[in-house]
Amino acid sequence: VEGALQLAQIAPDLAIVGEEAKTREGEVIGLFITGRLRPYMRPEQVMDQIHEMGGLTYLPHPLDRRRDHFRAERIVELADRIDIIETYNPWCEAAANQAAASLASDLGKVSATGSDSHSARELGRSWMEMSEYADPKGFLENLRHARHVITAESGTGRRA
């Protein structure tokens, strides 16, 4: 996070400071954060910490049974603290992505397409195109109307 904070100081138009934190129940990403997130806390505590920093909460791979994830019932309980739900992750099974999309829609949450890239060769397989924004609130609003792009190379399944 420290390096991202430095980059945001130098080139604020190029960086959104974010971190994925493991909670006791699943993972949460904080976007537009100003410091490190405390790991292994209750999800409510991590989400509140993100919002106290003026950031946005993002649930990655929310219903993927192969990784740490939240149950659908728990996502409903946490809905007031959730800003964005990832509805496409290339490493999730198609059924998990579809269930996440349905849940995000039912809850009226902003949906996001993730790339979950862990190497350079995984970059550019799925992304979102959105209008410029000035702050986290504008980001969230523009993300709601963004274009989801998923290439044939993205696919849904396991990493090689």
Q: Model regions: which residues?
A:
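Charged catalytic cores and adjacent phosphate/nucleic-acid-binding surfaces used
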Residues: 5-38, 44-48, 52, 65-160
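Short beta-strand/loop segments at the ligand-binding rim of alpha/beta enzyme cores
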Residues: 52-58
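Conserved beta-strand positions in the central sheet of alpha/beta enzyme cores
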Residues: 58-59, 86
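Cofactor-binding loop segments of dinucleotide-utilizing enzymes, especially the Rossmann-like FAD-
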Residues: 62
